[in-house]
Amino acid sequence: MSAPKVLVVDDEPEMADICVEVAELAGCEAAAVHSAEAFRASAVDTFSLLILDLSVPGMNGSKVLRELGERGSPVRVIIVSGMDQTTLESTATLARNRGADVRGVMSKPVRIAQLKALIEAALA
């Protein structure tokens, strides 16, 4: 069985690199994109998990979640953003209600052990 594929979407390359490394520690193949254009060019539905920053310039993270839900995308999502936990939880609930498969949220700065546990749980 091949390793799950994870796509990290974050405009901060250092943060994206951390998320990629943590996903790899969790046994996944991982890639990162840093712009709205690169995200739109990626075949998101071919990934098992999307780690999504809601605040990428040129991209509305809430709209991305809505579109994933509306088209019944099979990709699971973890939201990682600098927003407060309450806002992230509300965004996740709204996205789930619209059909997106949001498996967890985390405020930045990420805690490596917690992110690894979220990734493992999302893919279980």
Where are these regions (language model features)?
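Acidic, metal-coordinating helix/loop segments flanking the phosphotransfer/catalytic sites
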Residues: A31-L49
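Active-site residues of response regulator receiver
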Residues: D53
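Alpha4 helix (beta4-alpha4-beta5 surface) of REC/receiver domains from two-component response regulators
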Residues: K63, M83-V105
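His-Asp phosphorelay/catalytic-motif detector in bacterial-type signaling
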Residues: T46-S48, R71-I78, D101-V102
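Acidic catalytic/metal-coordinating carboxylates
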Residues: H34-S35, N60-R66
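C-terminal output helix
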Residues: T86-T87, S107-L123
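The feature encodes the CheY-like receiver
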Residues: P57
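Conserved acidic segment of CheY-like receiver
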Residues: S2-E14, C19-A23
